[in-house]
Amino acid sequence: MPWTILLFAAGSLAIPAPSIRLVPPYPSSQEDPIHIACMAPGNFPGANFTLYRGGQVVQLLQAPTDQRGVTFNLSGGSSKAPGGPFHCQYGVLGELNQSQLSDLSEPVNVSFPVPTWILVLSLSLAGALFLLAGLVAVALVVRKVKLRNLQKKRDRESCWAQINFDSTDMSFDNSLFTVSAKTMPEEDPATLDDHSGTTATPSNSRTRKRPTSTSSSPETPEFSTFRACQ
């Protein structure tokens, strides 16, 4: 066979690695079968193929003498067919019936779509968490606003109490500055003399003077009873 002569001439040279790919029908769950095709180069028909998963042998197949590849069919639900990276390798018999193995192929990953109910549940939980976070944020904002309004109300009440107290003090101070100008009533000199038991004389009448006030209408001082409340 041509490949036997090639191997004999190559000696210890490595055999080219095969190609690997996932073929349809593709699995939609872990219960569905997995189909993986492994193909050797054109000069190596009828080779023996080995499928690996994580360094462990999963399945062995031999290609027909006129074909250069095989398709591995891994039944669903089997412990040997979980999802994960797969590699394949092929081997041929060289001169003196010595087995020659190729390099490992590139990895192929098999993943399963997430079930719909899990997706719906995840979205529901995420929405509930976002809603809860939003409610907590709104509650904190409302509480902060209420505390601020309550503080403003307390400040206003304290300010008005201080103003009323200051107004009372100022009213008391105003009474000290109020001038009471009352004019004493005039009395007849004769009446005064009668009370004193003496006869009024012109000189006495002239010496008596009517009391007068220094101001007929004193003005009330102007001031403000309101003070700025910080």
UniProtKB/Swiss-Prot annotation:
Gene3D superfamilies: Immunoglobulins. Keywords: Glycoprotein, Membrane, Signal, Transmembrane, Transmembrane helix. Glycans are attached at residues 48, 97. Residues 1-19 form the signal peptide. The chain crosses the membrane at residues 118-138. GO terms for cellular component: membrane. It is a single-pass type I membrane protein. Residues 139-230 are cytoplasmic. Residues 212-230 have a biased composition (Low complexity). Pfam families: Ig_C19orf38. InterPro entries: C19orf38_Ig, HIDE1, Ig-like_dom_sf, Ig-like_fold. This is Protein HIDE1. It comes from Homo sapiens (Human). The lineage of its organism: Eukaryota, Metazoa, Chordata, Craniata, Vertebrata.
